[in-house]
Amino acid sequence: MFVIKRNGYKENVMFDKITSRIRKLCYGLNTDHIDPIKIAMKVIQGIYNGVTTVELDTLAAEIAATCTTQHPDYAILAARIAVSNLHKETKKLFSEVMEDLFNYVNPKNGKHSPIISSITMDIVNKYKDKLNSVIIYERDFSYNYFGFKTLEKSYLLKINNKIVERPQHMLMRVAVGIHQWDIDSAIETYNLLSEKWFTHASPTLFNAGTSRHQMSSCFLLNMIDDSIEGIYDTLKRCALISKMAGGIGLSISNIRASGSYISGTNGISNGIIPMLRVYNNTARYIDQGGNKRPGVMAIYLEPWHSDIMAFLDLKKNTGNEEHRTRDLFIALWIPDLFMKRVKDDGEWSLMCPDECPGLDNVWGDEFERLYTLYERERRYKSIIKARVVWKAIIESQIETGTPFILYKDACNKKSNQQNLGTIKCSNLCTEIIQYADANEVAVCNLASVALNMFVIDGRFDFLKLKDVVKVIVRNLNKIIDINYYPIPEAEISNKRHRPIGIGVQGLADAFILLNYPFDSLEAQDLNKKIFETIYYGALEASCELAEKEGPYDTYVGSYASNGILQYDLWNVVPSDLWNWEPLKDKIRTYGLRNSLLVAPMPTASTAQILGNNESVEPYTSNIYTRRVLSGEFQVVNPHLLRVLTERKLWNDEIKNRIMADGGSIQNTNLPEDIKRVYKTIWEIPQKTIIKMAADRGAFIDQSQSMNIHIADPSYSKLTSMHFYGWSLGLKTGMYYLRTKPASAPIQFTLDKDKIKPPVVCDSEICTSCSG
């Protein structure tokens, strides 16, 4: 039996050679637990005549990954095999790889079709010796197997469907793409990215330095006008943004309701549902970034709109397909008055924006005055109990996980962009709160800090966090100026207001590394101090930029220009960790370069790349299933696996018990200190999760993607959660509602083939807003 080598030559299969290759990659691993011979034997079983060495490496990596539940070092070995395989298939020098990407010729038409931009190529050519010399390829081996496979699938650039970039090449491309001729800053960014202190968002990793360098994650639009022209002009904007891998939030509260008169044609409106069907089909049609992500939009509606009940049914699993839009996400932009009416079991008037104009343009007391005026004038379409609408909201959430909930008054009252006008919607992932109108499309560029990295020698390094945040601010601020904008209205908005969004990932990992239970007082205190530090560092960096370049165009009249910062709007006094008054004085003197700074996003894909838990979320399970080409296998929370292995507590009995309990360790006989630290999201009171969101909210000037997890949701549980979040002043009341599937049938065996832990889908989830 023979294998085909990379150079095309045939060679007889040699077991010893396969074993030797695997053994070479076991350096530094625990040799008491890692068995290269076992991996090699399984590889031999999968060999067929004419198999390539690339396929052998791929198989060996997958086999090693399947052994991860035996010891965490197998995950490292799997990644090393996969990375080593890529290194053998790609050129080493960064400059040569960039040259190949620039010189790409489309084989279909013979035209020069550069994948990277000419300016990127010029910079690389001028500084190639320096850039080539600072890249440290060993850092590629720091990715875990699934992080590396995520990079391979969507992030590393390809020529004719063959990957040509290594992870380090990608990171240097991103750094050069952002900083261009400022090589020292590019190298600083490269090192921080490659050491995993932070990551830029997926669109930045995809597109920085390329011919179409669209690096922004989020776009917020208002419907231009309640007319055929306005609706279809807005649709075109959405299509052009979606084409360039942007996630969309769209407010439609100004579109007339069904049954309303249309003066131009003397007809009757069909309302928002047929219109949204058109938007849904556009989302389905547009394929973003060459299959990197399908088109996605979140549609925002205020609950006074007469079509609200039909809107809440849009994602239901049953009913007339003509009234469903399964490819759009739905979200509610809820005024406080609605919550008060629900609380008091009052009446709620449903209105048409054509007959009751201006409701979407006002908030707070002004909204209440206008709404009650229309009620007194009997301009409403109908009156129902507020709780009837509320019940429909809850039922939709229990069935579909949506609509998302955002509080209109909190979003406007506590926004540093309040001086621009009324904010009418958020984005696809509910963390961006920015002003948009018919002439401006709001944009946000994102990045996320890997909080686990700042746990150094058993303590959290706040000073290092502040320093890294300041680099991120400078990077995101540069992206605003060099970005490729899909539509001019987006460029106008972004350059006028210059908002950015800094988020986090690995909060749960940081708590675990410090041995803090997620719901402990220590974790709650650290949660506040982390976000206080991020906000402080971001403000300091933005003020320093304003000192050099001037404040953003619409700074005058903002809260910050009057010495009011986000925590003031929450009536919160910061800790004594940072000296706020001198910073406020400096901001009064120089202003800020950016109107908004902090926005914790979901980080779905980038957290997977860096091997961290998502965003600010606790772990959802301590064991789950991964799907790969060779089948399914179990992955255990790496922190838990390591601590149990070190304490000689890990065995098949414990593994099967955790699998039988759906990823929980609370019913095992493990020590109580471990059980407390490794509670899953289902075992942590949601009230604590919401309270921690409010605690950090005082230092988040945009908002945060906050999921609610309730294993067995009910009307009363969800209502209680929503009203608690609203009472605490949250801007985002809920991103998704996550529930547990119905209980599995009684399990008669603990055999791993019979027990199915939760499956984690390996597809891209909200890559656009993934920081």
From Swiss-Prot:
Organism: Vaccinia virus (strain Western Reserve)
GO molecular function terms listed in the Swiss-Prot or TrEMBL record: ATP binding; ribonucleoside-diphosphate reductase activity, thioredoxin disulfide as acceptor
Expression induction or repression: Expressed in the early phase of the viral replicative cycle.
Subunit structure: Interacts with RNR2/OPG047 subunit.
Cofactor note: Maximal ribonucleotide reductase activity requires the presence of Mg(2+) ions.
Catalytic activity: a 2'-deoxyribonucleoside 5'-diphosphate + [thioredoxin]-disulfide + H2O = a ribonucleoside 5'-diphosphate + [thioredoxin]-dithiol
Enzyme Commission number, as recorded: 1.17.4.1
Superkingdom in the source lineage: Viruses
Pfam families in the record: ATP-cone, Ribonuc_red_lgC, Ribonuc_red_lgN
Catalytic residue positions: 427, 429, 431
pH dependency: Optimum pH is 8.0 and above.
Descriptive protein name: Ribonucleoside-diphosphate reductase large subunit
Cofactors required: Mg(2+)
